Amino acid sequence: MRYGFTSLLALGLVAAAPAGAQAAGVTVSYNLDVGPLTVTEVKFTVSVAGGQAHGKARIRSAGMSRVFSEFGATAVGEARLGEASPEPVIYTITRDESDMRKVTTVRWDGGPPSYDPPLKKSDRKERLDAAIANGVVDPFTAVLRMGMAGDSPCPSTHQVFDGREVFELALFDKGAGKLDGDAAWKGAVQKCEVRWTPVAGRAKDKGVPGDSYDVAFAPVAELDDGRKLWLPVEMSGKLKGLGFRGFVTKVSD
């Protein structure tokens, strides 16, 4: 679950330019704090042009967490934009932990996505293939669909596939609010509860229970066609019993 959650957070916890700006390109840095420690740092770049959206997130362990596990990852996503919901094209994640590197790629070209490398366990692969046949998107496209849903990203439901796990993200409306803390985004937000539920893959097979998180979305940018782009600017909840908070620390064009 660690990477599944972190990759989604990395591709989603993005504050772009001030509201009303055109979403051409932006780089964002943020921290994920668990308890009193910053355990993960992320640098994220997103660009929107010519009917295509591209996102890249670099994730690495930070602070005392590096003593126990040297973890880093790069996630890259591409999606097609149009009048309907964004459609996934390709999603690649490269994970580095200690002296091991793993690369997983998912491609969409009509019908269910293909993924490489394949799963080794035949029974798990069978269940995973059945789940992705019902229609899934990658984490980057899921965030875009939340962000381009209209007047608010919630309520909505998304089936997400990162190449190894299929999980459901269900968003529920918790009303309007305002941020004025230490995050880079300050101002009005839409509060949502996000429920994460494993559908197929290792987490599902091992009986990992679902989780829920509080997320603050803001209309941080405006697309060329005038649509607002709602993106998460803060998240909080619990991971394995420890409280966490994700927040933007720096925004640059």
Question: Predicted regions span which residues?
Answer:
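Active-site/ligand-binding surface loops and adjacent short beta/alpha elements
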Residues: 109-171
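A generic signature of intrinsically disordered, low-complexity regions enriched in glycine/proline
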Residues: 7, 133, 142, 215-218
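Bacterial N-terminal signal peptides
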Residues: 6-16
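Acidic, serine/threonine-rich low-complexity disordered tracts
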Residues: 22-110, 150-253
